Amino acid sequence: MVCFVRPRAGVGGALAPDDSARLLAGATLRLGDATDAASLANEGFRGERFDALVSCLASRTGAPVDAWAIDHQAHVHALAAARQAGVGHVVLLSALCVQKPLLAFQQAKLAFERALIESGLGYSIVRPTAFFRSLSGQVDRVKRGKPFLVFGSGTLTACKPISDADLGAYLASCLDDPSRHNRVLPIGGPGDAITPRQQGEHLFALLGQAPRFKQVPVALLDAIIAVLGTAGRVVPALAAKAELARIGRYYATESMLVWDAAASRYDADLTPSTGRRTLADHYADLAQGRATNERAEHAVF
């Protein structure tokens, strides 16, 4: 198994090659730039033959320029290199939110999904729900006695959060499970779907505190988007910030569950589950200091 990684990987480029090697023990590590077709071919594939390609590549912020460069074009380069290397099957980590593609990064992901499906190679397109790290930004503030922030009532959305380990196992199983070949696969973690308010209630219970919530109106995000969108016509940097605000609004108002088009609603029962670890387990580890949470761009609050 060969892993193609950046020379400085991790959040903020904190991981040197030796750090990456320890995290990926047992794999052959190759360093390069996944957005550069020549680097991918010469430093990644190196003219060798491979059976499969597994890609977890994604833009960090979802801003339009990054999204089209990474979620789409870098994958197009990888697909071309994979074909040259004799790859027969591609496992792609996508995202469940592409069901309703209102944002640039969702459109970029969908564009590559279509390219992969039309490529003639075997594929497994995995669309996970929310990640634990994306839902863990308020642990420290609640430990400090502050209220848990929710948009609206805290019941506008729901999801089936999935752990990194459970998702990783699911991705790996796509290589040799024929039932997952040539399919688009939505997947969530174990248990019932939970709302942001329920997430807060779990956290308060773990910390032995009475639940306290502060409601943030969705209209506040609308106002921010309007101001930044208008200013962004003059200042490009503000246009990028407007897109980030749109991303925040999307996650504040859209559930990470399978969309039932016929019923025009999200449906937890249609959202498959895998794994054993729950968000409550993760919160317990964070609350007791048994785990840390490097969210980086995976945060709203």
Residue spans for each PLM region:
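A hydrophobic C-terminal alpha-helical subdomain
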Residues: 219-301
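NAD(P)H-binding glycine-rich loop region in Rossmannoid oxidoreductase-like domains
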Residues: 10-13, 18-84, 97-99
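Short beta-strand segments at enzyme active-site cores
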Residues: 88-94
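Residue-level signal for the nucleotide or nucleotide-sugar donor/cofactor binding architecture
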Residues: 35, 70, 159-165, 194, ...
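Short, amphipathic alpha-helical "lid/cap" segments that border enzyme active or binding sites
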Residues: 79, 164-172, 276-284
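Conserved glycine-rich Rossmann-like NAD(P)H-binding loop of the short-chain dehydrogenase/reductase
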Residues: 1-7
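Oxidoreductase cofactor-interface core, primarily capturing Rossmann-like NAD(P)-dependent enzymes
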Residues: 6, 16, 85, 99-211, ...
